[in-house]
């Protein structure tokens, strides 16, 4: 009986831990309004990608295969900057 409880507990903890890892992958491409990736010219450390990633609520970013990559970018923040731009454009349309 104790073995079953231990197995169930381990399975539940493993499932919860696995879900949390899926929510924050190590590196993810941030996306523009049209779901395209941000282009960059210099692979490796790249100030432009650093700025893009900071605007997407992450601390670290670099250029990989000529696209910006952000470390630990959550699913909610993949299009974070695009959502802000959309909101601003909607407000401008209302004003004008």
UniProtKB/Swiss-Prot annotation:
MF annotations from Gene Ontology: sodium channel inhibitor activity; toxin activity
Protein name according to UniProt: Neurotoxin 23
Distribution of this protein across tissues and organs: Expressed by the venom gland.
InterPro entries in the record: LCN-type_CS_alpha_beta_dom (IPR044062), Scorpion_toxin-like_sf (IPR036574), Scorpion_toxinL/defensin (IPR002061)
SUPFAM superfamilies according to UniProt: Scorpion toxin-like
Family that this chain belongs to: Belongs to the long (3 C-C) scorpion toxin superfamily.
Residue span(s) of domain LCN-type CS-alpha/beta: 26-89
Species classification: Eukaryota, Metazoa, Ecdysozoa, Arthropoda, Chelicerata
Signal peptide range: 1-22
């Amino acid at each position: 009986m104790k073995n079953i409880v231990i197995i169930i507990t381990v399975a539940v903890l493993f499932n919860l831990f696995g879900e949390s890892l899926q929510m924050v992958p190590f590196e993810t491409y941030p996306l523009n309004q049209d779901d395209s990736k941000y282009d960059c010219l210099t692979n490796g450390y790249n100030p432009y990608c650093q700025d893009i990633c900071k605007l997407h609520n992450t601390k670290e970013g670099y250029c990989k295969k000529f696209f910006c990559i952000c470390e630990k970018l959550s699913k909610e923040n993949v299009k974070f900057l695009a959502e802000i731009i959309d909101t601003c454009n909607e407000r401008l349309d209302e004003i004008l």
